[in-house]
A protein has these predicted regions:
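Active-site metal-binding motif and surrounding structural segment of the metallo-beta-lactamase
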Residues: 51-56, 63-116, 212-228, 243-247
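C-terminal tail/sorting-segment detector
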Residues: 369, 374-377, 386-411
């Protein structure tokens, strides 16, 4: 991965101009993916716009931020309705503005679904949210994939503690942060993970859910930092598994929580993840050359092979044949594929593995049991040996206690 920001080496102006032209040509020939981390202060809000124009709004900050920040931005972009909303969990700094946005847009402001973790919660913000979304409310499930079009998908990696805590999950039985929806946004070689306020340490209120889901996420380009940079999230096991090239911290200046903490910032720096922060916050300081405070929105534009963040250029993922090192990895090549796809993987446990292929609806397409070694080639057929149609598929490789997942695109 190359970054004009992360390595401390900035491209000469001439090369940057040439790159801008190339990116412009790519955008003109194929619309890309756009992700905007809106600055809603000490809250969360992420807008995803697929290459086909499908929109997904993940959280909308505190009450007041919906009409004060999110709605004006949507209107400035000519967005009169949303296809999807996602509530990562029911804390007011995440859902407080969702009802405001939905109520203020057009009559059919929500086209498809309002996705959340289900169950119930007893706060005014929750009641206002559920009233606004009405019959469009749907409970998201683990493994569910939302096809946003143009090759962009969002997969639910975890919800309601990833099975760690026992149901029921309502009325404040557990701290909401333990129950967060974790999403993996995928577009070609680009991957970004968003997990609300998911905790990574065991305390009197929190449970380490991060370590349970890390392998299912795998290496990503961008990590939306959990819990505004609290030291109770982003543990070292999680970070060393997802290895984010870039980390985004959504935080408010002068917050009373001391976010982001210096401990959290140091963890991100230790895995060489360049930091973009919406506001100054009230805690730790990003070391020189390791990140920047944007004081505004964080805008990510993704085209095949690369992405930019507020003008800084990065390469997406790892192309071609994957490396063979590392305790946990899964890569597929070629990807997209037209005939066969070879999966190269390593799970740090002995014994046979099972490989399962799913379609975007979560239906089992094929399964291969008692696979040994670290390479397997799928010929693109289903259980009944028929060739599967072109589209997006997911592979899951499972051992007795570990599993890895990745996306395949068949042409």
């Amino acid at each position: 991965m190359f970054s004009t920001a992360n390595t401390g080496r900035r491209w000469p102006a001439f090369l940057m101009a040439c790159l801008a032209l190339l990116v412009g040509f790519a955008s003109a020939s194929q619309a890309g993916l756009e992700v905007v981390g809106l600055d809603v202060g000490q809250g969360d809000c992420t807008l995803i716009i697929s290459p086909t124009g499908t929109t997904m709004l993940v959280d909308a900050g505190y009450t007041g931020e919906g009409v004060g920040t999110v709605l004006p931005y949507l209107q400035s972009r000519g967005i009169k309705a949303l296809d999807y909303t996602v509530a990562s969990h029911y804390h007011v700094d995440h859902i407080g503005g969702l009802d405001e946005v939905i109520n203020a847009l057009t009559r059919d402001s929500l086209k498809v679904a309002a996705l959340d973790r289900g169950w119930s919660y007893t706060t005014q913000a929750y009641t206002q949210y559920t009233t606004a979304v009405g019959t469009k409310r749907q409970t998201i499930t683990e493994g569910q994939v939302v096809d946003l079009g143009g090759g962009a998908t969002v997969r639910c990696v975890a919800v309601n503690s990833h099975g760690h805590l026992a149901a029921p999950y309502d009325n404040g039985r557990y701290d909401e942060n333990n129950l967060c929806v974790v999403l993996l946004l995928d577009y070609g070689d680009f991957e970004m993970v968003l997990g609300g306020d998911l905790p990574g340490y065991n305390t009197s209120s929190y449970h380490d859910i991060e370590s349970l889901v890390a392998a299912d996420i795998g290496d990503v380009d961008i990590y939306k930092v959990h819990h505004h940079g609290s030291s109770n999230g982003s543990n070292t096991t999680f970070l060393n598994t997802i290895l984010p090239e870039v980390s985004l911290i959504y935080v408010g200046t002068g917050n009373s929580y001391g976010h982001p903490t210096q401990t959290l910032i140091n963890r991100l720096v230790a895995v060489n993840s360049y930091i973009y922060q919406t506001e100054l916050g009230a805690g730790g300081t990003i070391p020189s050359g390791k990140g920047e405070v944007v004081n505004g929105n964080i805008v990510i534009d993704v085209v095949p092979g690369s992405y930019t963040i507020n003008g800084d250029v990065y390469d997406c993922g790892t192309a071609g044949v994957p490396p063979t090192g590392g305790p946990l990895f899964l890569s597929v090549y070629p990807n997209p594929f037209s005939g066969e796809a070879t999966m190269r993987f390593n799970i740090a446990e002995s014994g046979p593995l099972a490989i399962r292929i799913f379609d975007v609806e979560g239906r089992l397409v094929n399964v291969f049991q008692t696979v040994r070694g670290n390479t397997y080639t799928w010929d693109g057929t289903s259980l009944d040996r028929r060739e599967v149609p072109a589209g997006v598929y997911f592979v899951r490789i499972s051992g007795p206690s570990q599993s890895l997942s990745d996306k395949l695109v068949k042409r």
